[in-house]
Amino acid sequence: MQPSPTHRASFSIGSEAAARRVVDVLTEVFFEGDAAVAAFERPDGQWDVTLHFADAPDQAWLRELVVNSAGNEIADTLAFDTVEAKDWVKASLEDLVPVPAGRFVVHGSHDRDRVAPNKLKIEIEAALAFGTGHHGTTRGCLLLLDHVLKSSRPSNVLDLGTGTGVLAIAAAKALHRAVLASDIDPPSVRVAAENGRLNEVGHHVRVIRATGFAAPDFARAGPFDLVLANILANPLRHLASPMARHLAPGARVILSGLLTHQAPAVIAAYRARGLVPLRHLRIEGWSSLLLRKVG
């Protein structure tokens, strides 16, 4: 007997931030197993969002959901079709080649055996492409982490806004030390913890749900001598003051998730709290910053 086809809904959206927002809504609405949600960036900067269903969805209801979360213009791109039954996540990721970043290589399970043995392998098999290494912000953070590790071995690391957990996993693999990771989004907390276990650093990476630095875990675990935060420009600016309070003297901070034209404002916010910029990487229109706390 032939397996039943998979029902697919897909639409396009104009930015990573907008894609994150709508994917957050979709993953909250659908129970795990009811629908699988994926988002991938195209070469032109647009993001394709797809949902796969075992049973045909209510198209009118789903269109209304997309209108409410992304607007009429985005909903106009919504299309429905059926595809042959297969491991569609694996198929989607087959076009994503391993991404080298210094000593690190981020890859999917389909490329597990293609990575050189002298590299620190980070396997990310998430339903979402945020933080798989194929975005310039993730690669920039990994390159700056590699740079930091050439001259120091941080002993207390925080990955703020961990997403898939890729940065926390990288730090844990390189340092063989405990790393605290946090995210505001419950599905991201779950995915990051799962990825930590997949990469055999689950005993080093502790993932918590938190908004900014509000959770008491940060005060208990700090001060940190390395913080990684790959989020967005506005949250980064607002977090400058609380982050500075949780840093050890001389701590390094790696920031990304900001467009290149947004970097000066972010740098200014952190300079006002006693952090000086050391390096600035620009990849595909995105900036990644390395700063140091003076004192």
UniProtKB/Swiss-Prot annotation:
UniProt keyword Transmembrane helix present: no
Known EC number: 2.1.1.-
Catalytically driven reaction(s): L-lysyl-[protein] + 3 S-adenosyl-L-methionine = N(6),N(6),N(6)-trimethyl-L-lysyl-[protein] + 3 S-adenosyl-L-homocysteine + 3 H(+)
Keyword Amino-acid biosynthesis: no
Molecular-function annotations in GO: protein methyltransferase activity; protein-lysine N-methyltransferase activity
SUPFAM superfamilies named in the record: S-adenosyl-L-methionine-dependent methyltransferases
Subcellular location: Cytoplasm
Gene Ontology CC: cytoplasm
Keywords assigned: Cytoplasm, Methyltransferase, S-adenosyl-L-methionine, Transferase
Binding site for S-adenosyl-L-methionine: 138, 161, 183, 230
Major location (coarse): cytoplasm
Gene Ontology biological process terms, A to Z: methylation
NCBIfam families per the UniProt record, alphabetical: PRK00517.2-1
Protein family according to the UniProt entry: Belongs to the methyltransferase superfamily. PrmA family.
Protein purpose: Methylates ribosomal protein L11.
PANTHER family membership: ELECTRON TRANSFER FLAVOPROTEIN BETA SUBUNIT LYSINE METHYLTRANSFERASE
Protein name, UniProt field: Ribosomal protein L11 methyltransferase
Taxonomic classification: Bacteria, Pseudomonadati, Pseudomonadota, Alphaproteobacteria, Hyphomicrobiales
Encoding gene per record: prmA
